[in-house]
Amino acid sequence: CSKTFNATTGTPLSRLRDKERFEGYADCVRQGLSVRASAAKVGVTVDKAFRWRHRFLQSVVSQQPKGVAGMLEVDETYFRESQKGSRKLTRPARYRGGRAKGAGRKAADWVPVLVGRVRGQPYTVDKVLTRLNGAEVTAALKDAVKPGETVVCTDGHSAFLRLDKSLGVETRYFVAGYHGHTNKTFHVQTANNYHEQLKTWIQRGLRGVATKYLPNYLAWHRLMTWNKAGLTS
């Protein structure tokens, strides 16, 4: 092929300087340390620590559970579109987290995020979507489910209504307005609880993140839940 490669090609270590410090930095990411705390701990600049953060997290984005067995609760949530850190904005700036111009929730101002949580297990499926529709939901979940072993439980959104056919799995739907506010077996409370934890961490802990980095931060939160559950070393 007339090309050279080595063991680090295609990994976060490819063409990386100070490789001997990266393992220690990866441990800082697993612990959820800030950029400044991580930089001080491993002895690199704050700018390099930020670049390393996203170099590492990009490799975690695709590390999602596959062929899960059990109840997979699936629900969507939304994050306000953010151009944080951009030198040129494509829209008027918002100050102090103010509301976007225009009445109501314009689709262009919000980014849909799909979250699936395996009930009773520390496994999470997450995906930033361009639109919440059946095709994108199916693409996001197709590797996570296993026909005959996965039961998908969702709310009544139209994007979820044909998952039984598109994924070939058993589905259950829970609509609070129709079924009441509680159902001990079929519900999406585990997914909603994860939404709350995720939003609190991003909005309060990180003071918001740029939309272009949102997949990386979803992966980071997932990595920290693995670390808490003892699934990382």
Which ranges hold each PLM region?
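Residue-level recognition of single "structural anchor" positions
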Residues: 1-233
